[in-house]
Structures are given as C-alpha cells and as structure tokens.
C-alpha cells in the first residue's frame, strides 16, 4: 500500500497544496489532475523520494519511504515526462543499459520483444538521435513491457504518442493493475484504462 498523510508542498514562497491524503492499494491507479503549476509533478517527485514534503509523510507498505532506501527503490518504476534515453545509443542498448543500472535481469531477446511491442521492430540498432520524438518516447515506454515492480509513477506517459500507441500503453497499464500492481500518473489526455480501479485526485 502507498499512503500519503497530510502532505504539504511549498515551492519558493508559494504553497502548492496542503493537507493532502490518499491511500493506494494493489489494482488501483491514481490519476492526478490540475492546471499547470498546481503541483502534480512536485507530488510525483515527493512520491519517489526526490523532493521532501514541507509537512506530512509518505509510507510504502506501512513504513516511511525515508527509512527504506534501496528497499523502496527496488519496488519503484519511475517514468518522467522526459525520455531519459541516451541519444547516441540504440533503442536496444538503451533498454539493456537501463536494466543494468536498475540491477535487473533483461535478456537481449526480451529487450527486442519489448521494442517490437512498442512498434520499433527494425529500429533496434539505429541510434536514438535519428528517431522521431514519438519513437524516442516509445523507447522509454518499452521499459514498462517487462516491468515487474509493483509501484509505477508515470509523469505524462502519453505525451507524443499517436492514438494507437495511447491505446497500447493503456493496455500495458491495465495489465499491470490486473497483476495487483498500482500506479500514480499525470496526464492531460482522456485515457480509458480498461482494468483496475481508477481514482482521480485534483490539485489546485
């Protein structure tokens, strides 16, 4: 279970939100809504431990994330609004490098299969600098195909995707929820997640 208890966020001299509470269990997705500047990305950064809250506490499996360190990170998959890929590397090299840095096992065959699922068959060995923005986004999203960690934090995952890719990603997220995983995401798009319980939290 992921719990937020009485969270407060202050950036500069501006309070973005205060008294924020929620609980998220397996099979649930929390969709963060709100205008630009309402604190959605700041909340995601809090949930992954990069930004300490001004007040309140975040708990994972009943314990504060501040005390869990690597144990919490081992359960967490974070996908930011930036693609976080190396332009000089190929899609295949990017996937294998990301798995290595996360201390995860990912075979070359599984990485190629993931890239095929995101529509990059035949581009596995092309340097990412030659890909379109939508294709680069798909390289980043390919991580989710084989991802087994229970908690996904997704910042605008549908950016730069066409309609078919949006439907594909919604299916990947749905499968994660069906397996008992949970997710928190921000998106400006209307997306149908066919499985799991989708809850909405509006900021601002």
Curated annotation (Swiss-Prot):
Ranges for domain ABC transporter: 2-203
Localization (cell): Cell inner membrane
PROSITE patterns: ABC_TRANSPORTER_1 (PS00211), ABC_TRANSPORTER_2 (PS50893), CCMA (PS51243)
EC annotation from Swiss-Prot or TrEMBL: 7.6.2.5
Enzyme class, UniProt record, top EC level: translocase
Catalytic activity: heme b(in) + ATP + H2O = heme b(out) + ADP + phosphate + H(+)
GO CC term, one of those recorded: plasma membrane
Membrane topology annotation: Peripheral membrane protein
Pfam families, A to Z: ABC_tran (PF00005)
Keywords tagged on the record: ATP-binding, Cell inner membrane, Cell membrane, Cytochrome c-type biogenesis, Membrane, Nucleotide-binding, Translocase, Transport
GO molecular function: ABC-type heme transporter activity; ATP binding; ATP hydrolysis activity
InterPro entries attached to this UniProt entry: AAA+_ATPase (IPR003593), ABC_transporter-like_ATP-bd (IPR003439), ABC_transporter-like_CS (IPR017871), ABC_transptr_haem_export_CcmA (IPR005895), P-loop_NTPase (IPR027417)
Amino-acid positions noted as binding ATP in the UniProt annotation, renumbered to this chain: 34-41
Any single GO BP term: cytochrome complex assembly
Domain of life: Bacteria
Main location as per UniProt: membrane
Subunit structure and binding partners: The complex is composed of two ATP-binding proteins (CcmA) and two transmembrane proteins (CcmB).
Known function: Part of the ABC transporter complex CcmAB involved in the biogenesis of c-type cytochromes; once thought to export heme, this seems not to be the case, but its exact role is uncertain. Responsible for energy coupling to the transport system.
Protein name per Swiss-Prot or TrEMBL: Cytochrome c biogenesis ATP-binding export protein CcmA
UniProt organism field: Dechloromonas aromatica (strain RCB)
Gene: ccmA
């Amino acid at each position: 279970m992921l719990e937020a208890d009485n969270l407060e966020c202050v950036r500069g001299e501006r309070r973005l939100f205060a008294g924020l509470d929620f609980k998220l269990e397996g099979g649930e997705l929390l969709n963060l809504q709100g205008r630009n500047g309402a604190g959605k990305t700041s909340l995601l950064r809090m949930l992954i431990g990069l930004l300490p809250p001004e007040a309140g506490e975040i708990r994972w499996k009943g314990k504060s994330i501040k005390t869990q360190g690597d144990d919490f990170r081992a359960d967490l998959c974070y996908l930011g609004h930036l693609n976080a890929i190396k332009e000089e590397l190929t899609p295949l090299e990017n996937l294998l490098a990301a798995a290595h840095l996360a201390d995860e096992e990912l075979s070359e065959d599984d990485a190629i299969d993931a890239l095929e699922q995101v529509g990059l068959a035949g581009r596995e060995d092309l340097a990412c600098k030659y890909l379109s923005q939508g294709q680069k986004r798909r390289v980043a999203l390919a991580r989710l195909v084989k991802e087994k960690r229970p908690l996904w934090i997704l910042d605008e995952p549908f950016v730069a995707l066409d309609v078919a890719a949006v439907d594909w990603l919604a299916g990947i997220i749905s499968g994660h929820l069906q397996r008992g995983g949970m997710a928190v995401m921000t998106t400006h798009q209307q997306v149908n997640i066919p499985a799991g319980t989708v809850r909405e939290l509006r900021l601002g």
